Amino acid sequence: MFKKTLEIPADRVRSVKTTTRDDKQGKVTVDVSAAETRALKATGEEELLSENELDLLDLAQRKVPTTEGLRELEALNKIAPESSRDDPRADQLEMAAAPSPKSKLRLVLSIVGPGFLTGMAGNDASAIGAYSIDGASNGYGHLWLMLLSTPLYQAVQFACAKIGRVTQRGMAEILRTHYGRRVAVLASLVLIVANVALVAADLVAIGSGFELITGLSYFWFIVPVAAALWYLTVYRNFETIKKIFIALSLAFVAYVITAIFSGADWGTVLVRTFVPQIDFKFASISSAVAILGATISPYTIFWQVQGEKEQKRPGPMRRKIHMAALDIAAGVISGNLVAYFIIVCTAATIFVHHGQISTAADAARALQPLLGPIAKYLFAIGLIGAGVIAIPILLASTSYAVAGTFGWPAGLSKKPWQNEGFYLILTVALVISMALALAHVDPIQLLFWANVLNGVLTPVLVIYVLLVGNNRKIMSDQRLGILTNIGLVVAFLVIAAAALLLFYGLLTGQGS
């Protein structure tokens, strides 16, 4: 009646004692950590994971922050949640049980996780559009914002990772449990509105990519792309396809190289990077809100909490949090560097010639100094790859938030008939986004204003991160440090101030 089903890899078995006359039961000795020991005393089915290190390709693939990557992590994480309340001896036992990387490359891969790849994946198709429009419209004027947003982005993402690691819960579930359902509903609504707009923008971006390649209107690609992504996300393990599109999305790294050969005025670039230049015109303010929203967005807040919750890291809590900080720093710096050079590149090639970005082809012109006539094809490939990777993540984060708000079972590792509510939310969000994408809204304007909306909504979630991260009942002795708190407060003030200036411009008719 009270038996527990175990799956024990052979490498975890240390000795086997068969039945004797005096002892009717045999004895199997296995290596387990303190966390696993506690889990074995709980009800339900558990699984002891193999100590053997994954091969390099498998290890790398499990770090990819796609819906499929999260599905794999969910399947692995059957051991009970770890907690900051573990005693030091338990942490030491966990450290002893954890396998050591065999090479420097494996060590790097063991650190790289949701933080790095969320930072890089944050440069989705709509974000690329926002950065390109900013560079083409404002030149080098907002480069200082990219520098300022880097430590702020680090603070926000680190706080989210720490919350996920310590609580082993999703953000919406934490808010519902400790602050009530109304607070959780508000946070989920913020995320839903932002994500639906971003998914619509990314669908349009993918369609625009196909338009550059085929010459057919982007409009005809939206429904097939949405249907294919829904099917792959819900029903299929699209591991091979995922690898291809991740590689395609790296095409935007070409902006870094192009910026170097674009003839940019590097003296002006350096001045504009370190000396803030604030322009209170509506076009400049709205563009500033867009790039802030593209950098620190609602979905990355929810996704970082969920990703760190699912990420397996060896060692005691202090080491896990330190590894998460390094992971996030790598992602934030890499992602913001790409965004920085996109602005430099478009400023040096489009702004200086008084050009504008009205279509995807206009945005592709920024790559022509390096790539010539093939620029539009590489840009199209990048748009398609970035969009295909981002949309499932946006949909999944929406489903996790709503499911956590109402206490529904959630997880991509379960089949649709086992998780009807979770997959219904995902489907409804995609249908609404598809309808918005089909509404004949100007594609470039949709890309831009989706990120403006992100910038307006993000401060609400930053406040929630502050509240949760400093709540003793939730975080125990692992509350956020003073530097992280300062970063969160400054992030809130900067983004909120930009949003207020945007609203002032709209109310005074500057946006018309």
Model-based region annotation:
Residues 181-182, 219-223, 330, 334, ...:
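Loop-to-transmembrane helix boundary motifs in multi-pass membrane proteins
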Residues 91-96, 130-135, 158-183, 208-210, ...:
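Flexible loop linkers connecting adjacent transmembrane helices
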Residues 162, 166-167, 184-215, 222-226, ...:
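Hydrophobic transmembrane alpha-helices that form the core helical bundles
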Residues 250-276, 288, 292-308, 464-473, ...:
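Hydrophobic alpha-helical segments and their helix-loop junctions in multi-pass secondary transporters
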Residues 188-189, 213-235, 251-256, 420-432, ...:
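Transmembrane alpha-helical segments of multi-pass small-molecule transport proteins
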Residues 224-225, 233-263, 453-454, 458, ...:
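Membrane-interface loop-to-helix entry segments
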Residues 118, 145-179, 186-197:
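Juxtamembrane transmembrane-helix boundary signature
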Residues 152-166, 306, 310-314, 333-362:
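Extracellular/periplasmic helix-exit of transmembrane alpha-helices
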